């Protein structure tokens, strides 16, 4: 009889341990990855007027003239970089004058070639035609873990052509960067739709 009572006691203790070890806050379960909270700046726009064009850009960004192109001098004085310092991103704006249809077609083809280089890692691409009073062009939205998700070109189709491409100076991670990408994309769209050729 004593063995039976000891057996019951051990069995009750084992059952108690099994159930007390199961709780809803299991420390062995990995928690989902989170990213730091991002403080977005207030949006106000200011006018840039230089070379043959003008546009509005956010006042939290800094615009500077591009002085070099790889290891040489920039091809002309109308190349600019729009720095989004708080997000470690840069919108590269490259302006090209042209004088004939062959040069114009080459600029368009070069733009499509540069956009297509992202196709290797892209999961998709949307091309949005842009029609303005003094300009027309195309806005490219490239999906996936690519180096540049937003690119565009604008032209008057007779003498002036500008190309823009947004790059971040960090490792591409679409999950952590998407909210920043969307925030800056709205400012790039504002830049595009406020754009005017002045000459």
Predicted features by range, described:
Residues 23-26:
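Bacterial signal peptide processing site
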Residues 18-21:
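C-terminal motif of bacterial Sec signal peptides marking the signal peptidase cleavage site
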Residues 48-109:
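Secretory pathway targeting signatures of secreted, lumenal, and periplasmic proteins
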Residues 59-71, 115-129:
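Short secondary-structure junctions
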Residues 28, 122-199:
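Short, well-structured beta-strand
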Residues 45, 49, 53, 99, ...:
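Extracytoplasmic/periplasmic, Sec-exported soluble proteins
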Residues 30-52:
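Post-signal peptide N-terminal segment of mature Sec-exported envelope proteins
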Residues 2-10:
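Bacterial N-terminal signal peptides that target proteins for export
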